[in-house]
Amino acid sequence: MALRLLKLGATSASVRVVAAGAQRVRGIHSSVQCKLXYGMWRFLLGDKASKRLTEHSRVITVDGNICTGKGKLAKEIAEKLGFKHFPEAGIHYPDSITGDGKPLAADYNGNCSLEKFYDDPRSNDGNTYRLQSWLYSSRLLQYSDALEHLLTTGQGVVLERSIFSDFVFLDAMYNQGFIRKQCVDHYNEVKSVTICDYLPPHLVIYIDVPVPEVQRRIQKKGDPHEMKITSAYLQDIENAYKKTFLPEMSEKCEVLQYSAREAQDSKKVVEDIEYLKFDKGPWLKQDNRTLYHLRLLVQDKFEVLNYTSIPIFLPEVTIGAHQTDRVLHQFRELPGRKYSPGYNTEVGDKWIWLK
């Protein structure tokens, strides 16, 4: 195989790269479309970030506990500011941006299940940590997509959660005894070698909804799996947000905090955003050269995901070579997945010999 396993050891690295939309160029053509990547010559010829980034080129993340209205607020903010909205990255985020966009089987998505986590968070098959590790990789991929969009178009982006807040779930899982200390160490090691390459958001918006209200909303929503979430787990998520995440992010970027009622008034939130000075954080220290290197990174999805695979044995996310080979071959047998887009006759691609 050309690549390593996708961070979680659930699928082959080749499967992971294809699922993430990253393809190595071979020969002259890699697809039927021209996909000239941004590089040194375009930079030297004048294609620089300063020409497209404006005061509206911002990265905004909306955070909060489960069922706090993050998606609704994020979408409304994006619409009012003219930003691009990125819905929260889930297990099937790689599927949503590749192929026909349809979700693939669990074998190709970390071999984990959110529903199973809600039903049995202490399952001894390692599902809980596989889920968390896979979701971190999905959020990492999405954050790179958001930064790539920002640097390529100059348009601001709004995300629901990010790689910077992902750890709140890990903390809650560990505090509740769902995962082992070795899993926490593995996660922190992966995070330390990946998150350091990325600039934090310009702004974090936190929706503060008390745990009893969160539980009431979950019951009203009626999802039979979510309804099994305990108040202790939700409280640990809130504690991680308030005691660790918000204090850390307040040193790196702007932070706005709203109650459940205040978050419903997106017009007022947008007004508050427009009054912010955005006078702190690492974005202020960037220039064309540093943004050039950042753009090179985020456009290369292979490199984005590369360091989420580390040589540490952890039963929860490790599989054998035979299983890896089997999953890889099964993936390659799926329609349109054997070769690069445009080169698969089984899905109707034609004139391949001319490409």
Curated annotation (Swiss-Prot):
GO terms for cellular component: mitochondrial matrix; respiratory chain complex I. Signal peptide: none annotated. Residues 1-35 form a transit peptide. Keywords: Electron transport, FAD, Flavoprotein, Mitochondrion, Phosphoprotein, Respiratory chain, Transit peptide, Transport. Binds 1 FAD per subunit. It comes from the Eukaryota. Its main location: mitochondrion. The modification N6-succinyllysine is found at residue 285. The modification Phosphoserine is found at residue 250. Its cofactor is FAD. GO terms for biological process: mitochondrial electron transport, NADH to ubiquinone. It is found in: Mitochondrion matrix. Phosphorylation at Ser-250 by PINK1 is required for the binding and/or reduction of the complex I substrate ubiquinone. Complex I is composed of 45 different subunits. This a component of the hydrophobic protein fraction. PANTHER family: DEOXYNUCLEOSIDE KINASE, NADH DEHYDROGENASE [UBIQUINONE] 1 ALPHA SUBCOMPLEX SUBUNIT 10, MITOCHONDRIAL. Accessory subunit of the mitochondrial membrane respiratory chain NADH dehydrogenase (Complex I), that is believed not to be involved in catalysis. Complex I functions in the transfer of electrons from NADH to the respiratory chain. The immediate electron acceptor for the enzyme is believed to be ubiquinone. Belongs to the complex I NDUFA10 subunit family. This is NADH dehydrogenase [ubiquinone] 1 alpha subcomplex subunit 10, mitochondrial. It comes from Pongo pygmaeus (Bornean orangutan). The gene is NDUFA10.
